[in-house]
Amino acid sequence: MAVSRVLSLLATVASMALVIQETHFAAGADMGSCYDGVGRAQRCLPEFENAAFGRRAEASHTCGRPPEDFCPHVGAPGAGLQCQRCDDADPGRRHDASYLTDFHSPDDSTWWQSPSMAFGVQYPTSVNLTLSLGKAYEITYVRLKFHTSRPESFAIYKRTYASGPWEPYQYYSASCQKTYGRPEGHYLRPGEDERVAFCTSEFSDISPLNGGNVAFSTLEGRPSAYNFEESPVLQEWVTSTDILISLDRLNTFGDDIFKDPRVLQSYYYAVSDFSVGGRCKCNGHASECEPNAAGQLACRCQHNTTGVDCERCLPFFQDRPWARGTAEDANECLPCNCSGHSEECTFDRELYRSTGHGGHCQRCRDHTTGPHCERCEKNYYRWSPKTPCQPCDCHPAGSLSLQCDNSGVCPCKPTVTGWKCDRCLPGFHSLSEGGCRPCACNVAGSLGTCDPRSGNCPCKENVEGSLCDRCRPGTFNLQPHNPVGCSSCFCYGHSKVCSPAAGFQEHHIRSDFRHGAGGWQIRSMGVSKRPLQWSQSGLLLGLRGGEELSAPKKFLGDQRLSYGQPVILTLQVPPGGSPPPIQLRLEGAGLALSLRPSSLPSPQDTRQPRRVQLQFLLQETSEEAESPLPTFHFQRLLSNLTALSIWTSGQGPGHSGQVLLCEVQLTSAWPQRELAPPASWVETCLCPQGYTGQFCEFCALGYKREIPHGGPYANCIPCTCNQHGTCDPNTGICLCGHHTEGPSCERCMPGFYGNAFSGRADDCQPCPCPGQSACATIPESGDVVCTHCPPGQRGRRCESCEDGFFGDPLGLSGAPQPCRRCQCSGNVDLNAVGNCDPHSGHCLRCLYNTTGAHCEHCREGFYGSAVATRPVDKCAPCSCDLRGSVSEKTCNPVTGQCVCLPYVSGRDCSRCSPGFYDLQSGRGCQSCKCHPLGSLENKCHPKTGQCPCRPGVTGQACDRCQLGFFGFSIKGCRDCRCSPLGAASSQCHENSTCVCRPGFVGYKCDRCQDNFFLADGDTGCQECPTCYALVKEEAAKLKARLMLMEGWLQRSDCGSPWGPLDILQGEAPLGDVYQGHHLLQETRGTFLQQMVGLEDSVKATWEQLQVLRGHVHCAQAGAQKTCIQLAELEETLQSSEEEVLRAASALSFLASLQKGSSTPTNWSHLASEAQILARSHRDTATKIEATSERALLASNASYELLKLMEGRVASEAQQELEDRYQEVQAAQTALGIAVAEALPKAEKALATVKQVIGDAAPHLGLLVTPEAMNFQARGLSWKVKALEQKLEQKEPEVGQSVGALQVEAGRALEKMEPFMQLRNKTTAAFTRASSAVQAAKVTVIGAETLLADLEGMKLRSPLPKEQAALKKKAGSIRTRLLEDTKRKTKQAERMLGNAASLSSSTKKKSKEAELMSKDNAKLSRALLREGKQGYRHASRLASQTQATLRRASRLLLTSEAHKQELEEAKQVTSGLSTVERQIRESRISLEKDTKVLSELLVKLGSLGVHQAPAQTLNETQRALESLRLQLDSHGALHHKLRQLEEESARQELQIQSFEDDLAEIRADKHNLETILSSLPENCAS
């Protein structure tokens, strides 16, 4: 049943909508187009649509906020509930209002749901659903589809317009009266108000439980529904902008009364679809709606309508009232008819009623008016309706009415004329309300009638006034015949005010030629003069032309009174003729002018000659003038007329006959003499001040010509004599008095001063200057200043010397001294001021890097001749090398020699001294330390320090032999010449013997050992077969025999061992030197005596110094420097002592070599034994034939060879002795060099101590009285005295400190003595051990050599008996040799054992020394830190001292004591800067000692002003000296400093290179800019 009712209701709604649509549209009308096919307007409507689709609906209550459970009904009551959950935060469980108007699908339904009854949703609590349509719609139906059962009561409301009240549309309720107070089933009768909402219970049943529909038709039950277009009430009824669904009561089964939560959760509102059918309301004037510019939905209006709903006409379409479009009539808005003169109109209902056109035009243009702008405004007209309206423009004063006729002509008053009545009739002027007034112009000054508008008369050039009745300023004498009306005032240009002069009458200057030419002369072109042709009738004018008649003197001169008057020429012309062309020429005052006649007479046909007159007006306004002149210049020409001539150009071809000049008349004036017409053109001037005379031609009394002798045209100016005399009016020269002079008496005479312009007799007073010379007065103060002081003097009273001079000319500071020129050696700018002191003459602005009282010295940092004539020869910068100099800008001012660091030479300290190398910044150079024996000279490479070595010598100091060389001596080292095949190494022993490989023997390892032979291919020595063992045994026996023979030889008295020997050929070792021994012994003894003497001298000097130090009392005044010198000398002697010890060590090494060479070795004994053996062989030679002969021959050969060797060895010994002597001399030279090296150090240390003591003197006073800096310079001398007293008090403390320092130094030397002795002992032991080893090696080698020789003799002796004898002797010799070798070897072992013990002792002592050195290093670092702090403190004191000395120097320039203090302060700054640089360079390596530095800072911070500053300074000095010694050592710090200095030097060189490059670039840039500026403008681009 319910489904059938819903379907029937939907059918009813559909049929009703169809009826409405058919009612809205006529048959065949196109609903979507507003115009038909021919362009006629027709009703149009937007498409029918679901206005709710896609629009956002709002619900007052929605489930899921918070989440809740709901249990929908799925069957009959009592069936089980299947509960679900509504959660707005979960999209899958959300049921908000957006699901009301979305796309509705029965298969996948979405719905909006309210909270359940469990949350209080039940009557009287309502749930509202609101839908905003965005604009007015014409609603056809409203449809709701419920997801649950339909409510028991709900209502539909609507708004007719936005923000309007809610109006009920329909009520649905099973209790209409109870719930809404409305009867159920109400219906309307025709004529009743159809805007009534009905209430029905048709859709209030609980079934169906889901999917129930409710459809509401807006026109159902409305009687006028079928006449909708004629019913405004129903049109308003269906119009809605918003729809509201109010859900008021739920349908239940009645089980809710038990309040079961599960039951309550089953009752709620749920709507799955909310549809609103209708059209966008456009009143039949639009076919579509779209968003406007504001984003609001609006109709796209047609039919000249506008508005959101097309509810009104456009502004200019108001010709009929707006109406809704119907099927019969589209009711298009029509435009207003404004005749094209307006675009604005309004609807005028009264006009529409009377005329049928309601458009009333507004703001008509083009001067139109009327409802349709159809006529002209008042006082406008137009020729025809198509032409625009034009203003009448009738003159309000001249017209009778402002309205004109259709042609635009205005009605005029009398005396007024014109199209617009805007001008006066001729002879009238000044149009006004009363008409026009008649003109009254002056005839003499006007040129015609007056201006009809203003009434002003047209005046002549020099006339003014509305009636032209007065002359302009600067003119006078108004005359009718004057073309300009009035004549200009002349007055010689001094006045513009003049008037006619009284007492003058008219006068004529005339020539009538009755009695002759009257002084006239004629001149033709190219001819100076010619005779005149005169007759009683006149002068005959030439017919050829180019003739000029010159007037006599009476016409010339001052003719100013003829200005403006005519010159009349009377001519007699032939019958019927006319006068020829004639011009009047005027000359004067350097000007010239030609005039033509003002009028020419017309020719007359007469048969008699007739007279005619030609008139020339003497006025600049004459139109006939050629090259007219200004007024003033014209009158100036007349004032000095020098020529008046008549120039004829000849008669033309039409002229014939004679022309006679009958009369010439010039009108002028002169003073009144008789009755005659007055000459009103003569002026009298009103002269300004300073002028007088009728024409202002004279200067008044007290005035003069501005230009002397300038004449009347020159201006007059007051006499400028300043009341000290009078002046001539023409020259202006003053006759001065009162001691004044000048053209205007404007100045006092020389020797007088004052203000001559005051005009009093005592203006000028005598000058108070030397010799009453000239002076002047300062205007501001009135002081008198002398202006012509004697040469070299200046000042107000010449009391001081001129710039560049000095002296005291007036004796203001003592006896007068004349001013003398300052002598600045030509080193000042003569154009500058303040070059020297005006009192002392000391130069103040020295140029060219000079200084001194007379600029006679070079400034610090420069050197040269300050008095040289050329600037280029003057002082040049020191340019000291930063690496080798103490300061970059400190050098000898004359020679330029820089103050070099130790062992640095060169003018700029750029290279090391000979014997030194490695120039480093702040340190200087270090000694080459070239070995005196191994080097050629005590010079080395300046960078690497490599010494020039002797042959075979190597090492940086040339202190060792090269590999493969031996015998280090004065000649170098000799080549070992070891056999490359047999020697194990190319290096040999000091005795030249080589180390042999197995199987090789010999000094040079150049032969095979016994029982060995040289293998094939020279690959080495191989052992012989076993058969040669017998030979070896025999050789052993021979060696034993030789040993016996040696013992026998040593026991017997064989005489001198130096006799000739018969030995085998071989090379003697180095130690086998046996001749010249006594010479070497004597030389060595002498040298040792000299060294002992030198040592005694040093000790004696030291004792004398100790005694001298004991006698000198350092506490006495002035002895401080002496003590410092002694301390420095002590250090120098200590350094010298060290050098002597090093030299003694070297000499001991030489002595050991000499000892080894002075005593005969075992080889000598062997040689003696070989000689005895040879003699024995010679005695038995007769018994052994062949063998003896061969042995004898071998012995003799050996003897001869020995003799040769004897001579060579002797010569070598002598040469080596000389070499040793040279070595001694070289050692002595090296000792001298060492002393020379130590001397600069001592001098530098002495200078440093002096400087520190000198620096401390001014600082001690500041340390005790730090507040002294606050006093003025007046008490500086007292402070100096106080400082001297303090210095005297502190000097004993300084002396004690120095003594303590000396004691410490002595103790340090005493501590070093055991180490020195230990070193000497170690060196001696090492030398003895080395000598012993070498001697043993030589002995063994000698024995082996002798054995080899004897075995060779055996090979050459084949007889068995001889071999046996030789073998026996050789065996004895060998035995003796072996015993001796063992003995020498044991002795060497004992010596080496002692050396080992000494070496261990030395090592132990060395460790102790190392520990002590570390302690000393720590102490040195601590002292260094104290020195740094002291240096900083001293720096502050130095800066304070400098400031004080600078103030004192400025205030007391003449104080020599203060100047000396200033120089000392500068020396302090220089010394401290050096120390600062040294400390800064050492800072990196001393960073680990910060702890001790902190302790020292605390100590110094607690130091008060009453503590002994001298002790602190002495400690600082010791620390600095310790630092210097540490830097001089060759440790890691020295290495690092050297690396840093080298890197700094490289960087400085690179920076200097960059600066040089930059300077070159700047110079090139400057040159290019100069070239560019010198180029022409066209080339520069």
Curated annotation (Swiss-Prot):
Subcellular location, principal: secreted
Classification of source organism: Eukaryota, Metazoa, Chordata, Craniata, Vertebrata
Organism: Mus musculus (Mouse)
Domain Laminin IV type A: 508-684
Region (Disordered): 1382-1413
Function (record text): Binding to cells via a high affinity receptor, laminin is thought to mediate the attachment, migration and organization of cells into tissues during embryonic development by interacting with other extracellular matrix components.
Protein's recorded name: Laminin subunit gamma-3
Domain Laminin EGF-like, first and last residues per copy: 280-335, 336-391, 392-438, 439-488, 489-498, 685-718, 719-766, 767-821, 822-877, 878-927, 928-975, 976-1024
CDD domains associated with the record: EGF_Lam (cd00055)
Compartmental location: Secreted, Extracellular space, Extracellular matrix, Basement membrane
Leader peptide range in chain numbering: 1-28
GO CC terms: basement membrane; extracellular region
Self-association state and partner proteins as the record states: Laminin is a complex glycoprotein, consisting of three different polypeptide chains (alpha, beta, gamma), which are bound to each other by disulfide bonds into a cross-shaped molecule comprising one long and three short arms with globules at each end. Gamma-3 is a subunit of laminin-12 (laminin-213), laminin-14 (laminin-423) and laminin-15 (laminin-523).
GO biological process entries: astrocyte development; cell adhesion; cell morphogenesis; retina development in camera-type eye; visual perception
Pfam families: EGF_laminin, EGF_LMN_ATRN, Laminin_B, Laminin_N
PROSITE patterns reported for this sequence: EGF_1 (PS00022), EGF_2 (PS01186), EGF_LAM_1 (PS01248), EGF_LAM_2 (PS50027), LAMININ_IVA (PS51115), LAMININ_NTER (PS51117)
Any coiled-coil regions, as ranges: 1029-1046, 1112-1153, 1208-1231, 1438-1468, 1510-1575
Domain comment in the entry: The alpha-helical domains I and II are thought to interact with other laminin chains to form a coiled coil structure.
Keyword entries, A-Z: Basement membrane, Cell adhesion, Coiled coil, Disulfide bond, Extracellular matrix, Glycoprotein, Laminin EGF-like domain, Repeat, Secreted, Signal
Disulphide connectivity of cysteines: 280-289, 282-299, 301-310, 313-333, 336-345, 338-361, 364-373, 376-389, 392-404, 394-410, 412-421, 424-436, 439-450, 441-457, 459-468, 471-486, 719-727, 721-734, 736-745, 748-764, 767-775, 769-786, 789-798, 801-819, 822-836, 824-843, 846-855, 858-875, 878-891, 880-898, 900-909, 912-925, 928-940, 930-947, 949-958, 961-973, 976-988, 978-994, 996-1005, 1008-1021
Entry keyword annotation includes Disulfide bond: yes
